[in-house]
């Protein structure tokens, strides 16, 4: 039996930091193929995650540790000594693409990375094959906000696509990505343009592409529009994964025609079948939500009715955590057969 210790990265959010070890342990228990157990431990007053495995961690597991939401370094535990293990370079772009933006309501970037990792680890069929071959996957966030999920997708080497009803949020995303690309001196193209179909305006679309030597470009695209209109906006395009952070209780209605006011539950009931239709077979939908407004059982029913298969065994019941007094967040992943 081999034991490895993962040193946790610091978290800026003190509430999340207190739960990061437990959440990352649950993440690695699902993403490390050869781990027999993962649990928080304290060694000489420092918190680590202990990973037990039959043999020393192979490259696939070290890659899972490297891309995990809260890992800083990894060691092989030999008696009372720690032998450093070199983690592979898994990030395609620098992490400051994700960490620079600071604004009220931003989803914690460590949690976003966790949700993305779990969703991609759950892919099946051809989607899983593309992932394992290192191909760029297509990730959709139909509640994109200012683009944390899309930026995390870029960091992981995947293409990010989104829909966001708040035009100012899309403008802020476009400004940040454009400035970041220029400051990094990366070969790129980006811009925002109006979108019209059948003689009517569908809003605006921001597109960005960054080119790398001897590698496939990374692309990003975001429409202004309603989350439930995602299939209309993206047309026939399909995605390997949908990864999104559902609204926690604020109004998230349409701006087209008369203003609609929808609860988060109403939005998800209306939009999840649309998002499920945009998934490729074997693709996965990963979502976080506020359990104080919608029970897990109700959400499982909505996902199942949309033709998805929720992953709901005990391993998936370890991610519930407090955000603040009015938000208790959990996540769920469902696969399209």
Predicted regions and their residues:
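Class I S-adenosyl-L-methionine-dependent methyltransferase catalytic core
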Residues: 1-27, 77-140, 144-337
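N-terminal auxiliary segments of SAM/dcSAM-dependent transferases
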Residues: 2-82
């Amino acid at each position: 039996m081999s034991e490895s210790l993962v040193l946790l990265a610091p978290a800026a959010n003190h509430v999340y930091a207190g739960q990061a070890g437990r959440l990352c342990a649950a993440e690695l228990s699902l993403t490390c193929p050869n781990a027999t157990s993962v649990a928080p431990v304290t060694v000489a007053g420092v918190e680590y995650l202990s990973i037990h495995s039959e043999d020393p961690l192979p490259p696939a597991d070290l890659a899972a540790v490297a891309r995990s939401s809260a890992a800083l370094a990894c060691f092989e535990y030999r008696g009372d000594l720690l032998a450093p293990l070199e983690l592979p370079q898994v990030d395609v772009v620098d992490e400051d693409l994700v960490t620079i933006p600071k604004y009220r309501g931003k989803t914690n970037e460590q949690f976003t990375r966790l949700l993305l990792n779990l969703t991609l680890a759950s892919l099946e069929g051809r989607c899983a094959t593309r992932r394992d071959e290192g191909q760029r996957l297509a990730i959709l966030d139909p509640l994109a906000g200012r683009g944390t999920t899309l930026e995390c997708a870029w960091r992981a080497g995947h293409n990010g696509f989104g829909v966001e009803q708040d035009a100012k949020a899309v403008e802020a995303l476009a400004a940040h990505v454009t400035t970041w690309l220029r400051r990094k001196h990366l070969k790129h193209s980006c811009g925002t343009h109006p979108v019209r179909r059948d003689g009517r305006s569908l809003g605006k679309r921001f597109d960005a592409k960054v080119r790398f030597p001897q590698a496939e470009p990374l692309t990003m695209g975001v429409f202004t529009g309603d989350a439930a209109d995602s299939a209309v906006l993206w047309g026939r395009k399909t995605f390997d994964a949908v990864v999104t952070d559902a609204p926690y209780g604020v109004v998230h209605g349409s701006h087209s025609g008369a203003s609609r006011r929808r609860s988060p539950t109403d939005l998800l009931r209306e939009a999840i079948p649309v998002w499920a239709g945009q998934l490729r077979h074997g693709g996965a939908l990963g979502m976080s939500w506020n359990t104080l407004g919608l029970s897990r059982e109700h959400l499982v029913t909505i996902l199942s009715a949309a033709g998805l298969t929720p992953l709901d065994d005990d391993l998936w019941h370890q991610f519930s955590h407090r955000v603040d007094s009015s938000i208790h967040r959990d996540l769920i992943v469902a696969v399209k057969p």
